[in-house]
């Protein structure tokens, strides 16, 4: 079992300062061991977004004796110490970050007196991408020529001296685009967004990768893999490379809008400026107004289409360079965020599925079932995106109450998903602090999971499958979900149905269907019922496959926006509970008594099953999850025995009478092993 850690190690009661994570200590490595962790996310080697020289120091600098006394390590040493203990540390590429920080220097600029956090001493200046690329402080940092002896050139063959200017994305009006969500409130520093379509920036990333691999990084993680979409949502990017590539995109994807355009010389910036558009129009909060701008939907699609080539460029260099230098291929991951549809093209290039779960709530088993399908059979782990419920968990921990945290960590495992342990997890600078686990509770939970790992097979038993049509989801994201990325990405019928079925304690699986993961007869054969929520973009071959499966006795139920080719399968409902009741007619392998605040999943295990039961009965006053006195289940088979495993440890009991299972005194998390 992967036990990921959201391992940014930001300091408590301080802001989260990207892009360079704090220096690690040996005790922090031991903490990972104590919690049975084995995969560190966002853990080291992130500072190339300040400058390549800064990254080199982060990897290789000598540690002063005073810090050695407390076990401090440079990042190369940190990676090695993790490796000795079977722990995989990931280096991180920030694709949406170019930083400039205030600094203070001695008068002759031979000594750095302060950086980011100023002291009011010495001579003021800046350290960042501009200064390090132009050798502004040669007495402090090595020359940029050490890393790029021949310099860098843009796509026209012209030398790029100022990397900040040469890399940054620009708006319609020629302004820089800022990655403002990373900047600390009230701080005088700046985070610019680069353009991933610039060949010169990709060359810089390749050198960054080489330093990471030379430092021993076994995994290179791409954060902000979709920086081009982020730029498009901020009024860009209109650099010369994007304008060239957009012309080629329109040639390959013509439409009625392009019929009268000379695509050999078309300049989208000049086209919009001539029509009177400005940055204000391209960043209008009303998404419908934005999408009504001529060719803007195509421009957004172009930027999304450019994401995959950028990831391929990184992935190929990571694997080729690491194989050459170490004899082994380093792994590649990307922050696939909320399992958004536009991440589909990148999934296949990732060795592990890593992301950032948004909109964390007390209960979200519906999402986790979808997330398991998004994993596509690969292993992975998601960090938490900070929000109100995360802050509530932190308040509970501060008060010595850990039930909400335990539920937060265990609930996804019931459904084949994985949330990383927050170890100095970032809070998006919503408050001046970072997220750490309750240490003793986490150590006990890690030991319990290791002992009971065989009960988490992630092979789920169900008669019903909910089909996730990635093509339809992508269409919804582009037309109504671009400003709902942290919620339902414009696909509420699918996500609402999944949660409704979980609330009704109905077992089901999600069938993730996409160009890279097509629907097959073998996938359909495992089920008696297929539900199609807003699935209107399946290719004809897959519709025919559904019809053939239906003729053999399968039940197809379409809801939401229904494909005209499947109109006869539509079921109209006024509310999700009505739909859930209709779907329950096919029966279930496990029929649960109506018990408030109970979730379940059924893992196939050898010749038996493991029934996972999740208790959501959080008392809002005491912040304690109250015991469920009794729950009864009618099983579709007659087990010979039932063994109970609970966390936290409790007096939970189970008994069998034929095919009826009764469980008493359910703790937060209970697994009933049915043999």
Task: Please tell me what each predicted stretch does.
Residues 14-33, 57-86, 199-206, 306-313, ...:
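Aromatic- and glycine-enriched glycan-recognition loops and surfaces
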Residues 23-53, 77, 215-219, 408-415, ...:
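Catalytic domains of carbohydrate-active enzymes, especially glycoside hydrolases
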Residues 279-284, 305-341, 347-349, 355-675:
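Carbohydrate-binding surfaces of carbohydrate-active enzymes
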Residues 29-76, 97-116, 227-242, 296, ...:
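Aromatic-lined carbohydrate-binding/catalytic grooves of carbohydrate-active enzymes
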Residues 5-24, 189-204, 392-401:
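Active-site mouth loops of central-metabolism enzymes
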Residues 8-14, 45-47, 94-98, 225-227, ...:
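Active-site beta-loop-alpha junctions enriched in small/polar residues
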Residues 3-9, 40-42, 89-91, 220-222, ...:
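Hydrophobic faces of well-ordered beta-strands that scaffold small-molecule active sites
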Residues 31, 120-365, 370, 516:
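Polysaccharide-binding and catalytic clefts of secreted carbohydrate-active enzymes
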């Amino acid at each position: 079992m992967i036990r990921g850690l959201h391992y940014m190690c930001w300091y408590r009661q301080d802001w989260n300062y990207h892009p360079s994570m704090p220096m690690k200590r040996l005790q922090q490595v031991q903490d990972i061991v104590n919690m049975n962790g084995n995969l560190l996310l966002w853990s080291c080697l992130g500072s190339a977004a300040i400058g390549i020289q800064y990254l080199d120091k982060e990897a290789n600098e000598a540690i002063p004796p005073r810090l050695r006394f407390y076990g401090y390590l440079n990042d190369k040493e940190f990676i090695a110490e993790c490796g000795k203990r079977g722990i995989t540390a990931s280096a991180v590429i920030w694709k949406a970050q170019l930083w400039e920080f205030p600094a203070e220097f001695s008068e002759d600029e031979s000594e750095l007196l302060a950086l980011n956090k100023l002291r009011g001493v010495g001579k003021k200046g800046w350290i960042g991408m501009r200064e390090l690329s132009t050798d502004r402080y040669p007495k402090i940092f090595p020359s940029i020529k050490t890393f790029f002896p021949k310099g860098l050139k843009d796509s026209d063959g012209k030398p790029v001296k100022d990397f900040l200017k040469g890399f940054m994305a620009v708006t319609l009006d020629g302004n820089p685009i800022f990655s403002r969500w990373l900047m600390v409130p009230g701080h005088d520093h700046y985070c610019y967004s680069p353009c991933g379509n610039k060949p010169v920036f990709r060359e810089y990333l390749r050198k960054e990768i080489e330093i990471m691999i030379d430092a021993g990084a076994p995994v290179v993680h791409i954060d902000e893999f979709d920086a081009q979409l982020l730029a498009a949502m901020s009024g860009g990017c209109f650099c010369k490379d994007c304008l060239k590539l957009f012309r080629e995109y329109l040639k390959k994807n013509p439409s009625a809008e392009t019929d009268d355009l000379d695509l050999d010389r078309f300049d989208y910036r000049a086209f919009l400026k001539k029509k009177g558009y400005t940055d204000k129009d391209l960043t209008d909060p009303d998404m419908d107004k934005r999408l009504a701008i001529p060719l803007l939907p195509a421009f957004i699609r172009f930027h999304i289409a450019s994401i995959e080539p950028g990831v391929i460029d990184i992935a190929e260099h990571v694997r080729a360079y690491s194989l050459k230098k170490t004899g082994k291929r380093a792994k590649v991951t990307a922050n696939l965020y909320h399992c958004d549809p536009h991440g589909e093209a990148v999934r296949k290039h990732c060795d592990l599925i890593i992301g950032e779960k948004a909109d964390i709530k007390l209960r979200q088993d519906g999402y986790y079932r979808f997330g398991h399908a998004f994993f596509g059979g690969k292993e992975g782990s998601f960090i938490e995106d900070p929000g109100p419920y995360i802050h509530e968990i932190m308040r509970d921990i501060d008060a010595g109450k850990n039930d909400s945290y335990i539920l937060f960590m265990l609930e996804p495992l019931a459904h084949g998903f994985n949330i990383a342990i927050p170890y100095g997890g970032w809070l998006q600078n919503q408050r001046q602090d970072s997220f750490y686990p309750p240490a003793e509770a986490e150590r006990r939970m890690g030991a319990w999971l290791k002992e009971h790992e065989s009960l988490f097979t992630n092979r789920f038993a169900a008669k019903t499958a909910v089909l996730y049509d990635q093509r339809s989801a992508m269409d919804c994201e582009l037309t109504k979900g671009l400003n709902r990325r942290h919620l339902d990405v414009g696909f509420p019928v699918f996500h609402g149905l999944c949660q409704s079925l979980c609330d009704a304690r109905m077992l089901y699986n999600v069938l993730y269907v996409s160009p890279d993961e097509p629907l097959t007869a073998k996938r359909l054969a495992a089920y008696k019922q297929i539900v199609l929520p807003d699935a209107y973009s399946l290719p004809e071959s897959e519709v025919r496959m559904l019809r053939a499966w239906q003729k053999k006795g399968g039940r197809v139920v379409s809801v939401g926006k229904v494909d005209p080719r499947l109109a006869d399968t539509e079921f109209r409902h006024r509310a999700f509970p009505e739909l859930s009741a209709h779907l329950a007619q096919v029966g279930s392998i496990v029929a649960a008594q109506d018990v408030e605040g109970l979730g379940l999943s059924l893992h196939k295990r050898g010749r038996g099953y493991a029934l996972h039961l999740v208790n959501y009965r959080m008392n809002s006053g005491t912040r304690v999850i109250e015991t469920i006195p009794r729950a009864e289940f009618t099983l579709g088979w007659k087990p010979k025995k039932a063994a109970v495993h609970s966390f936290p440890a409790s007096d939970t009991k189970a008994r069998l009478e034929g095919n009826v299972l009764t469980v008493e005194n359910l703790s937060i998390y209970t697994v009933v092993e049915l043999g």
